[in-house]
Swiss-Prot record:
Family classification: Belongs to the class-II aminoacyl-tRNA synthetase family.
Cofactor note: Binds 3 Mg(2+) ions per subunit.
Gene that produces this protein: lysS
CDD domains associated with the record: LysRS_core (cd00775), LysRS_N (cd04322)
Lineage of source species: Bacteria, Pseudomonadati, Pseudomonadota, Gammaproteobacteria, Pseudomonadales
GO MF term (any one): magnesium ion binding
Name assigned to this protein: Lysine--tRNA ligase
Organism: Pseudomonas aeruginosa (strain LESB58)
């Protein structure tokens, strides 16, 4: 057994000993009272509200006012006369007043452990140091904690354990709680932003018979009653566009997508996506709307449009750079010429040399995108709209009027990561059918991320879809930016993990 394994074994033995002691205490509670886990205590205040409401009250003013309160929370520190509680908003001390609390209550308090949840009544007071606290007149145990909290000096520092036991992580790490409060604020602000502009929030199927709307490998399942294969959706796009056909001219959805792909600091198989569509608009309108949304989000969450991330600062207040795929390759790789990019064999050689997985059947447009992904994407630090993607890799986007080999599409990159994907939607049913057929050929040639042929979607387009622009924004990656989080797992409450050995 290695030294590390020995240390782990000793820690586990110590934890088991503490758990056994706590279970003995719970047994004593069960014996002493009929209900060990009561649910009749009702607090009337949160700690943060008390701190804010009475911030300007002096010790003497609080003493004269004798303001009664009922509070509840988890014991995080026990300093003998003072117990530090934590609720969902803040921490606050409660005072164990030996003059007012009954002897039996004082005896019970001595048996309580860190992690236990209590409910207390008392009056507000302020210490000589200026700290607000509750001078308790009564207190009781509401929930006995059977497992010890992480060591107060080291906390829960093992990253993998933080992800596996998010409930403990949230208990002991304020930074984690802040991250997920910000995530909630971001989603709420997006909803408000779009609703104020006339967008209707909708819900579309998670289980689909044909996985469409993105180039990705789906999760497959089986519907027993219908005896048919079904797929967890990789995107809601084709259903949202059906709604535009039906007459809902501005729609959006914030929900989960599922892609049977690798796990990394940027990817989780289950992730949250915003998709929105607006009729009588194009991809340039969406660029303007996206800039406005991102500026408002940064201002609302951070109080500034300068977004710190690691050792960098992203400037959301400045106009986002707009650059085509083709031009971006030339800008960031001066050794590559336009002639190189327009020659299939030369482009294939460049893509291979850059490390792209070239199969040999790719067209020029696909090769250009491969080169972009390998040689440019990671260099796009400040916000960049990369536009005019080749039509081969944009099977749902409208061709550009001036150059039909590319589409009216953009992807937004910040910090070298794709944050959004948008385009003027293809509403020509015949063109869409042809592109689906090209995707089927790609799939037959070995590309398991190529799209299926969706006959019902073609049927919908044949009824006529107005000129439309659509966009998808990855909520998880956006929250990563706004919370300065290095990994997507930091912003997903329960990320997917390999089973523990």
């Amino acid at each position: 057994m290695s030294d590390q394994q020995l240390d782990q074994h000793e820690l586990q033995q110590e934890e088991n000993k503490l758990i056994a002691q706590r279970k003995e205490k719970l047994a004593a509670v069960r014996e002493a009272r009929a209900i060990a886990f009561p649910n009749d205590f009702r607090r009337d205040a949160y700690f943060a509200d008390l701190q804010k409401q009475y911030a300007d009250k002096t010790k003497e003013e609080l003493e004269a006012a004798a303001i009664p309160v009922k509070v509840a929370g988890r014991i995080m520190l026990n300093r003998g006369s003072f117990i530090v509680l934590q609720d969902s908003s803040e921490r606050l001390q409660v005072y164990v007043n030996r003059k007012t609390l009954p002897e039996e209550t004082l005896a019970e308090i001595k048996t309580w452990d860190l992690g236990d949840i209590i409910g207390a009544e008392g009056v507000l007071a302020r210490s000589g140091k200026g700290d607000l606290y509750v001078d308790m007149t009564s207190v009781r145990l509401l929930t006995k904690s059977l497992r010890p909290l992480p060591d107060k000096h080291h906390g829960l520092t093992d990253t993998e354990q933080r992800y596996r036991q998010r409930y403990v992580d949230l208990m002991v790490n304020e930074e984690t709680r802040h991250t997920f409060r910000v995530r909630s604020q971001v989603i709420a602000h997006i909803r408000r932003f779009l609703s104020e502009r006339g967008f209707l929030e909708v819900e579309t199927p998670m289980l689909q018979t044909i996985p469409g709307g993105a180039a990705a490998k789906p999760f497959e399942t089986h519907h027993n009653a219908l005896d048919m294969a079904m797929f967890l959706r990789i995107a809601p796009e084709l259903y949202l566009k059906r709604l535009v056909v039906g007459g809902f001219e501005k729609v959006f959805e914030i929900n989960r997508n599922f892609r049977n792909e690798g796990v990394s600091t940027r990817h989780n198989p289950e992730f949250t996506m915003l998709e929105f569509y607006q009729a009588y608009a194009d991809y340039e309108d969406n660029m303007d709307l996206t800039e406005e949304l991102f500026r408002e989000l940064a201002q609302a969450v951070l109080g500034t449009t300068d977004v710190p991330y690691g050792d960098k600062v992203f400037h959301f207040g400045e106009p986002f750079v707009r650059l085509s795929v083709f031009d971006s390759i030339l800008k960031y790789n001066p050794e590559i010429t336009a002639a190189d990019l327009n020659d299939v064999e030369k482009a294939r050689a460049i893509a291979k040399k850059a490390g792209a997985k070239v199969l040999g059947h790719e067209g020029l447009g696909k090769l250009q995108v491969m080169i972009f992904e390998e040689l440019v994407e990671h260099k796009l630090e400040q916000p960049h709209f990369i536009t005019r993607y080749p039509f081969e890799v944009s099977p749902l986007a409208r061709r550009n009027d001036e150059d039909p080999s590319v589409t009216d599409r953009f992807e937004l990159f910040i910090g070298g990561r794709e944050i959004a994907n948008a385009y003027s939607e293809l509403n020509d049913a015949e063109d869409q059918a042809e592109r689906f057929m090209l995707q089927v050929k790609e799939k037959d040639a070995g590309d398991d991320e190529a799209m299926h042929y969706d006959a019902d979607f073609i049927n919908a387009l044949e009824y006529g879809m107005p000129p439309t622009a659509g966009e998808g924004i990855g909520i998880d990656r956006l929250v990563m930016l706004l919370t300065n989080s290095p990994s997507i797992r930091d912003v997903i409450l329960f990320p997917h993990m390999r089973p523990q050995a």
